[in-house]
Amino acid sequence: REVIVMSFSCPHCGNRNSEVQMAGEIQPKGCIYTVHVTTKQDMNRQIVKSEFCSVTVPELQLQIPARAGQITTIEGILQDTVRDLEMGQPVRKHMQPDVYEKIEALCERIRGLLGEETDASHPVQPFKVVLDDPSGNSFVEYTGSIESSGGADAKWSKRDYPRTKEQNVALGLMGDAAAENGGGFSKDEGE
């Protein structure tokens, strides 16, 4: 897969940002990656997340909608989520106290999953992370060995799926009018 990595780092304020844009083509099918996190080592799995990919943590009833693509880790996604949620909390505390409390509780639950800095093999509170990418361009690191018989990665799974017409429209593979009429060209039909 081809990606363009854009990275920014400000030497004055310390702000850093990395963003990924897919340079290659949209894949023939969408994909869903599922990772069962049980150790700190699982939190360090590399992730290439396209701008079409949403992330779900079912145990928290948390769904992170698709936004800018990035190269990160599971831990990085959770840390970014806490940072983004906390951004408006001081104002929200006075303007919408009930919403403030709910967001604060969610941030605490995410921090609980992040745990303390410990050894990579140290167990953490188990949870599942699901990446759903209709473009098929995201990737989650596979830590097993494909060649060896006993080296499978039992915590990692990938499932490809055919896209819906709505997903094809969102990806620019089909126009709105073609989707309404049930026609149009999708990548699956052309191959």
Model region roles, listed by residue range:
Residues 1-4:
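Short, flexible, mixed-charge glycine/proline-rich loop motifs
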Residues 6-15, 23-191:
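Long C-terminal interaction/binding lobes of large macromolecular proteins
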Residues 18:
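Short functional micro-motifs and their immediate structural scaffolds
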